[in-house]
């Protein structure tokens, strides 16, 4: 179990290199490198645009007194998508673009919502002070 993260990193590197070699064999190395750079740029601009929309929606929910938990899950998926799109390679770009799709974000939201709770500072309510008894003391 301790070796699982390291194994996943090596597996990801193997998949990325294999796909890169196959694409480069078909399209050529220069075109393949341009595709990797282009997909990263397009992905980052998509994440930036969707991130601003999500931020505005989160502010609107907070202003209306509603829970922004769904927007929080969406923002986490956007951050993860942005990270995956920054990693050079076609497989991680595919995973990052997959996380940008609204149906995938909705299914992630439905799976993660039961595990989220939004904390709002509101002070204490109730307790012994509510019945009028006050105790003075020194520390």
From Swiss-Prot:
Family matches, as NCBIfam families: PRK11463.1-2
PANTHER family assigned to the protein according to its UniProt record, in alphabetical order: UPF0716 PROTEIN FXSA (PTHR35335:SF1)
Protein keywords: Cell inner membrane, Cell membrane, Membrane, Transmembrane, Transmembrane helix
One Pfam family matching this protein: FxsA
Protein localization: Cell inner membrane
Family: Belongs to the UPF0716 (FxsA) family.
Gene name of this polypeptide: fxsA
Species: Serratia marcescens
Sequence intervals crossing the membrane: 17-37, 78-98
Bilayer topology: Multi-pass membrane protein
Primary localization class, coarse: membrane
One Gene Ontology term, aspect cellular component: plasma membrane
UniProt name for this protein: UPF0716 protein FxsA
